[in-house]
Amino acid sequence: MSEQFHLGVVHDGDIATAVIHGDLDADTVPRLRAAVSGLLSNGTMHITLDLKEMTFVDSSGLGAIVDTARSLRAAGGDLSLVNPRPSVRRIFQLTSLDDALRTAAGEQA
């Protein structure tokens, strides 16, 4: 069972920061996809996913993050990932997604 998932979004100009709370897995990915779809349809081109409260990510969650990055790049935007927990960072490293996605240990400057 997934840890209670919720997503908080804060806008700062043309950048949206989405803080993921809980597990990003097959049960919760549709909620992330819906939120990203809403941001894209509103013209948001730069999204930062703050992972400090994300407790777990499975393959469907990784796929959703990769799909988000591809969609934004195709539209001329970008995706940044910040503050992953060590266990989540390790998953990105094991899957080589840390090289494919822009990931930062701390808040972006």
Where are these regions (language model features)?
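STAS-like cytosolic regulatory interaction modules
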Residues: M1-F56, D67-A109
